[in-house]
Amino acid sequence: EDSLSSRFDRKEEGLIDIAVIRYPRISNFTDLSVLEQIGQVSVRYVDSVRDLHHPDMIVLPGSKNTMADLKWMRENGLEALIKKKAQDTIVFGICGGYQMLGETICDPYQVENGGSMKGMGLLPAATELKQEKTRTQVTGTFGEISGALSGLSGKSVRGYEIHMGSTVDSGSNVDNRSTVDGGSIVDSERVINPESRGNEKRYMCRIQNEADGSVKYDGIFSDNVYGTYVHGIFDEGTLAETLVGILAERKGVVLDTGQMISYGQFKQMQYDKLADGVRKSMDMEAVYAMLREAAI
């Protein structure tokens, strides 16, 4: 609880400033942990118009109740301000945040509150909440990204999906059986030649389900606005550093990259520290003896 409190209470703005919308039902906010490890970068959790200021990127994270949290943003003025800032500021939605950025959210099975509501309208996307929950580990690559984050094009992606819903590109005329995300791609030719998919060229990532090998397109982007269902999307390799580099170049500032390490390296260092602590606190010879005895 102390770590959550300190994370949410951070107010200082770094050379690169990332504002994460802290709705009442925020979830999976560890998606931004990788960015918190980079020097000169601030990750602030914002729940009011007054505190948003002028960030280099706005992130709409996951939500335990997308429709209720969107209604909360609509009522406190954050939605209107984010829509205004999206004209020249990068806005990135993950999972529930991605659903909010679209044109409509429909809940025919009363997964959340039932009914339907208008989205923020920043992405040509329509979401239908489903009764079945998607849970899967995925790997893949970014597609041909345009706009401010074009530097992510072709980069490797690794993460996971956990959501109730399917989102389609409402601006395309493609059969919804081949959803942008939320379902396996029916026509393998479309995987090989994504450029033949018309408006579906807006997809963020081409990802593969690590469990069954199925492939699909995930996410949508338009102008400065990007959305995806993939949690941990910035964790792979040096992707977070690439993102921060893009933000720095866009802002016209230079970061000290000498101290940067990949998030994978950072996590391994933490695991090593944990292992060292366990070894110092336990009689490891006794543990090994029990393991040897159990193996007999």
Kindly label every feature range from the protein language model.
Residues 45-57, 65-76:
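Glycine-rich phosphate/ribose-binding loops and adjacent secondary-structure elements
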Residues 63-159, 166:
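Cysteine-nucleophile active-site neighborhood
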Residues 174-175, 180-181, 186-187:
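Long tandem-repeat architecture
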Residues 57, 88-92, 114, 222, ...:
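Short, flexible coil/turn micro-motifs enriched in small/turn-prone residues
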Residues 1-44, 49-56, 122, 126-127, ...:
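C-terminal lobe/tail of nucleotide-utilizing enzymes
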